[in-house]
Every structure is written in C-alpha cells, then in structure tokens.
C-alpha cells in the first residue's frame, strides 16, 4: 500500500503493531520456557493474556475503520525477537539468562509503547472518533482501545523494571 496521506500512515501503523503483537504473542511462550524465575514466568503468562486481548482490540479497531485486520511485516519487531533469541540462546547460567530475558522483554515493551503512543497521537490529530461496542462497558472510541493497550504495556514495563531491580539483576550479579 502506497502511503500518500496521514490516514494511510495511521493504517500502516496499525498494521505494523498488529503484526508485531502477533509475533510477540508467539515469542512470549518461548521466553516463559527459558525463564527460571517463577515471578518472571508468571508475569509473562499474565502478559500473554493481555497481548491476546490487545490483538482482539486491534481487530476491533480495524473493523471500526471498515478494514480487514491484517499486519505488514515489521522488521523492527523481527529484529528485536531475533536479537533476543540469539542473546538468550548464548547464556547457560539461569540467573544471567533471566536478566537477559527481562532486558529483551523490555525492548519489546518499549517498542510497543512507542507504537501505541504514536497511533494515539495520529488518531487524535486525524479526529478518528469511531466507536466499538464493548458490551456491558458500552461504546469506546478506537483511541480509548489503543490507550488501554498503551497503559498495559507501560504497566508491564514497570513490573519488569521492579522485578529486575529487586531480584533478577541482583541474582545475576
């Protein structure tokens, strides 16, 4: 798709994060399998569920925009995943590996925070006010759905930082 307008750029950004979220959802179970810290594993398990919900929200955003949910290859996401897998695969010590897993997970979170923040800013600038029925919650604008995902990503980043600072990095050192 040729990007000729800001709206085209917005759609491309949605497709980019859609692809990235789906790739990250495939990567989280691998990280869980290689992690040894129980709190880290449980945190990834909970975030995998959040990631699946974020993908569902993106499906709803696409539908509200009259688009078929689809991704475009996101080289940044693939690069983060490849680098993480290579790094984690080179580490035998479980504590050091956990520290690398946290750092890799935070690289993913920071990418997602960037993408969702950008998409929200673009949607606001474009005046995108489309709504999605959320059942008992009522209707939410697509900006609200993107904000929910952004808030979850920021929360996951805070949790990873706290776990790294309080336990994982100390054990690795």
PLM ranges: what are they?
Residues 1-173:
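Amphipathic alpha-helical hairpins
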